[in-house]
A protein has these predicted regions:
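Short amphipathic alpha-helical segments
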Residues: 17-19, 73-76, 103-105, 219-220
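Active-site loop ensemble at the mouth of alpha/beta enzyme cores that anchors a bound cofactor
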Residues: 220-228
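Glycine-rich phosphate/pyrophosphate-binding beta-alpha loops
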Residues: 151, 155, 207-221, 289
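A generic structural signal for short beta-strands and their flanking turns/coil linkers
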Residues: 186-188, 202-204, 227-232, 271-273
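Short acidic/glycine-rich loop or secondary-structure boundary segments that cap or lie
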Residues: 155-158, 200-202, 213-217, 241-245
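Catalytic core of DAGKc-family lipid kinases
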Residues: 30, 77-204
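ATP/NTP phosphate-donor binding region
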Residues: 1-63, 70, 74, 315
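ATP/nucleoside-binding phosphotransfer catalytic cores, i.e., glycine-rich phosphate-binding loops
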Residues: 194-195, 225-226, 235-315
Length: 315
């Protein structure tokens, strides 16, 4: 079959287009038969992947970063669910700044190395998270699938602030957004229900993880495993700005000492979660804002669902 490569020319801080030739050269050197298209706007990757599946291309290869992977993955899943068939295999090529999904799956993060994995044709399935949320009216619903994590509260709040700081780039932009977000000290009262318990009370953040690493350096769900058939939900209430600033560096630790060890932070294993928040909260999935304001959110696990081209011992 012919592979469809969906390349995001804006990936890696607008350097994706410069790497098109390297991608094509690597794939040709490995004897891959492929057709390459480029995204032209946000969410275009989802439409291109959906049409590629409908037109019989396989595998579907996303060349970009985590936002690109998420768009393409959602197009694959939508096509599979519409036709009630197995999802088409997904291949990953690293053109982004962080490429968290590839790091989480222990895949090579150079173009030639990743191309060799795709050409080898070995498949392993991972779990996917599903998030369903409603707008404030409760009438309009949005469903999204994620491979890394999704969150409400402080995490997407910082993402929104970062998007509005258009005059800065790189890590200093995220640092400033974080400081502004913490200074505002946002808090939410939530009702959180899951298979095995519930919680009603204040929170600073809620994150639901399928993989441990997100945002390049943050382990928001440090014990999440994309092969275990469950999601990791982490919630916590940290009331003061000083305490938040003390806890935040611990989100960058992958092992002992991570923020989930803080007494105000709780980590649970779930197959589903339902959340109601007051006031409304922003919501992101794999780093992309889905709602700037929502109050009702549901999470579900799709175990052993998405086939990804990787070595059999990639875990």
């Amino acid at each position: 079959m012919t592979a469809k490569i969906i390349l995001n020319p804006y990936a890696g801080r607008w350097k994706g287009l410069q790497k098109r030739g390297e991608v094509e050269e690597a794939m040709k050197s490995l004897g891959m038969d492929f057709d390459l298209v480029m995204t032209e706007s946000p969410h275009h990757g989802t439409d291109l992947a959906y049409q590629a599946v409908k037109n019989g291309f396989s595998p579907i290869i996303s060349a970009g970063g985590d936002g690109s992977y998420s768009e393409v993955m959602n197009g694959i899943v939508l096509a599979a669910q519409e036709s009630q068939t197995e999802p088409t295999p997904l291949g990953l090529l690293p053109l982004g700044t962080a490429n968290d999904l590839m790091v989480n799956l222990h895949l090579p993060t150079d173009i030639l190395g990743a191309s060799k994995v795709i050409a080898a044709g070995q498949i392993r399935r991972i779990d996917l998270g599903e998030v369903i949320a409603w707008d404030i009216s409760g009438k309009n619903q949005k469903k999204r699938y994620f491979a890394n994590n999704s969150a409400i509260g402080l995490e997407p709040n910082v993402t929104l602030i970062q998007q509005r700081i258009s005059w800065l780039r790189g890590s200093i932009r995220y640092l400033l957004a974080t400081l502004i977000g913490v200074a505002k000290n946002p808090q939410w009262k939530i009702h959180l229900e899951w298979d095995g318990g519930d919680y009603t009370g204040p929170v600073t953040l809620v994150t639901v993880g399928n993989n441990p690493l997100t945002g390049g350096v943050f382990y928001m769900a440090p014990h999440a495993d994309p092969y275990d058939g469950i999601l990791d939900c982490v919630y916590g209430f940290i009331p003061s700005r000083i305490q938040i600033l003390q806890v935040l560096p611990r989100t960058m630790k992958s092992g002992a000492g991570n923020y989930v060890d803080h007494p105000s932070v709780h980590e649970i294993k779930v197959s589903w979660v339902k959340i109601h928040t007051d006031p409304p909260t922003p919501l992101h999935a794999d780093g992309e804002i889905q709602f700037e304001s929502t109050q009702d959110i549901e999470y579900h696990i799709l175990p052993d669902y998405l086939p990804i081209l990787m070595y059999g011992d990639a875990k």
